[in-house]
Each structure stands twice: as structure tokens, then as C-alpha cells.
Amino acid sequence: MKRTAAFLAMAILPIALLAGCGAPEAPAAPPADPPKGVSVSLAQWRSDEPVHAIEVAVTNATDTPVYFSDVQLVTPSFKTLPPERADALLKRTPRTDLRIPYGAANCSPKGLPSLQPATVVAHLRTGSEPLRRVVFKVPHPDPLLTRLLRDECSAFLITEAADIEFGDDWTQVGKVMRGSLVLTRRSTGVVAVQDVGGTTHYIATPVEKSRPLATLDAGAQRARLALELTPGRCDPHAFAEGKKAFLFPVRATIDGGEERVVIVVPPKPLQERLTAYALKTCGLGG
């Protein structure tokens, strides 16, 4: 028995020693703090709006190049998208824009939400250092994100009650394109269109001048708003800069509440017809 106990003790001892000499601790993760002299802010160009994108404006106030592998906006106010590849080596610069898409706003049927804090997350390398994950805090509340959240959730509240779309009845009458916007019921509530704005290219003129311009009553499934479109500008430069030509702002209310704006975009075939009509009307060909 003593021999057995001694044998077991000798067998257990190396195991205990090995356990006590466990694997070395993993090295600490590199800090997520931004490099000194490198900062970001958010901006949006007109060309970004139709494609739901923003610019991460990077400032590098140092002489050390910084390589951005990818960039991502993270905030509870918008759905988080995967990191957007940047592959950008930035030397000293007062501002260099990195374009990224941003997710849909997280809206609520209860009303407009408040903006939540945001960060810009990037995988970057400073000089010859290894690539690391860095978190830039966006000053809160950011005015651009505040506007984007307000606009998108205002539209959400309207479209929860009714879809507002271009009808299929658009025809050219003389020098005017005539057709309608169609309101189609989705949920409860009286939806009233108070105004239809034009764009950089087109003047929108409601046929009926009384307010509201159209009303989708509580018991109705559909309503129409007769509309006329005419060219807003006829210079070639205007047609070359057509980034927002078809983003028509429609102001509407639900149950007599606050006016909110929803952007209504004609379908592609109608966009092509409107472009051809405007070019011809302006004497620019087409």
C-alpha cells in the first residue's frame, strides 16, 4: 500500500508542476485610443444623400503617415453595417474624406427618437506599427447624425401609415408633365399631404391649391394628388449635376399632428421619361 501511495505521489507531482507553470498570459490588446494628432468628423455631400452614405473626414496633424484599412460608424441610432474598406494611406492633411455607407435609422412608431452617442471604429496602422482597432468618439450630439435621424424617422412615421408614390399616369401635356402622387393605406390614421416641394431640376405644382392638398381619410384605402412638373433650370450644368434631381420632399401629417417630410422618388422608367422631357423642353436635345 505504501508503495502504491508513493507511486501515485510521484505521478501526480509532475502534473501539478505543469499546472503551476501554465501557459504564459496572452499579451494585452493594443489600446483603442486614436493616434495623437489624428481626429475625425462627419460630413455629407449632395452625392452621398441618394446612396445613404456619409464622409468620415480625417485630419492628420502629424508627419507620421496613418493607414486606414477600414472604417465603420457605430451608434444605437442606426443599424450597424460591416466595416467599409478604405485602403487609404493619409499623410499630413487638414481633411481627407473616406466615404462609407450608414445603416437605416432605428425608428419607433411612438415618435422621433433622441440621438444616441456615436463612434467611428477603424482598423489602422500608424507608421510601422501593426494594424490595430481604434475607436474615435464623435462629439455628441453630432449635428449631421441628428438631422439624418430626424429626417429618416419623420419619413418612417408617415410611411407607417401610408405609402406615398408616383402614380403610373404621367403624361406630357404641352410643356408640362402631368400625373399624380398616390397615397395607399398601410395602417390607421388620417394622412394629409400639406405640400410637395420641387428638386434641383423640377418645379412641382399641385393642381389643387387648397390645403391639405390630398387626404387619406380613416376609412379610405387610396387617395390621389394631381401634380404638374416643369423644368426648374435649363442650363447644361444643371443636368450635369443631377444628384438630387428626383428627391421630391413631401410634407404630410398624421391625424392633424406635426408636419413631417418624406422623400418620394419616381421609379427609374419615369425618371428617364422626365429627363427626356426636360431636355426637350429646355431645347437641349433628347
Regions inferred by a protein language model and the residue ranges of each:
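Beta-sheet-dominated interaction scaffolds and their linkers
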Residues: P27-A57, A61-D63, T146-R178, R273, ...
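Short, acidic/polar linear motifs in exposed loop/turn regions
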Residues: A61-T64, N106, L183-G189, G256
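Intrinsically disordered, low-complexity Pro/Gly/Ser/Thr-rich segments with frequent PxxP/GP/PP motifs
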Residues: P76-K110, I203-H237
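C-terminal motif of bacterial Sec signal peptides marking the signal peptidase cleavage site
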Residues: L17-G20
